[in-house]
Amino acid sequence: MPPHISIYQHPQEKGYGAALTVIGSALWLLIILSVFLQKNPVAALIALVIYGLLLWVMMKFMAALFRAWMVGSMVVLSEQQFPELHAIFVDVSRKLGLETAPEAFIYNSHGVMNALALRLSRGRYVLLTSALVEAEDNAQLRFVIGHEIAHHVLGHLNSAKHFIRYPAFFVPFLYPAYSRAREYSCDAVSAFLLEDKNQALTALQMLACGAKRLNYEMSPSAFIDQEKLMPAFAGFCREIFLSHPRMTRRVARLMSLFPIVAVKPDRAPSSAQDAA
């Protein structure tokens, strides 16, 4: 990970990650210890190894099936297919320290705006929904793409880490808190790449709004002010179960990190090339 990227990690991400690692490791040790306390520890250990191998084979097979679905039902970005978007992926990946860009796909989401980063076996992937590409312009898409690639760069999809931490995922509220910190980290890393930080604010706000015709009329400051309307206790109770912070907080945090003057864009895209 490039040093200039790591400084944008949320302070709580490392703490929650360390807690997951420690608790997960301790629980794995307890599981192994319980095996050796059985009446026939050798048989129990063999059974554990067999179940582990079966699970590993099943996960590999499911990953292969999912990739087959992506290749057969989605559109792969390349130099020949949507070269402008593909160039953004390559440029963002290079700036974040990846020699090879993740394989990128666009799929028909039937109106759902989303993007996600995946790690299947050793392959890195980023998926964009059609609704997202339709609603956001190229600068906003650069932010979304940077956010998803940051998940790969910051090690959020590391299989070994997930395995060690897996038992701790069942500790109430711990994994969601860690996940929310990761989202803040990726927002900051991606915003760092943009010359116009306002594009990061509006890109996030578009995920809440979703209306293409309103893209160039959004006010991030007004959006952040919605936090004043949030019932404190209800807002807290809702968020502690979520993997992502609420959007108003994500926009507010970016404004606190970067010298952003939140303004509404003064023009709409002048051509089809400007629009995503």
Region spans (language model):
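Post-HEXXH active-site segment of zinc metalloproteases
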Residues: 154-183
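Catalytic zinc-binding patch centered on the HExxH motif and its immediate surroundings
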Residues: 107-124
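Pan-zinc metallopeptidase signature
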Residues: 224-276
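Short pre-active-site segment immediately N-terminal to the catalytic Zn-binding motif
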Residues: 130-143, 180
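Short helix/loop segments within enzyme catalytic domains
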Residues: 80-101, 173-229, 259, 269-271
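Active-site recognition of the HExxH zinc-binding catalytic motif
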Residues: 89, 128, 143-156, 187
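Hydrophobic or amphipathic, alpha-helical segments that drive membrane association/targeting
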Residues: 1-112, 172-173, 267-276
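Catalytic Zn2+-binding segment of zinc metalloproteases
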Residues: 139, 149-165, 195-198
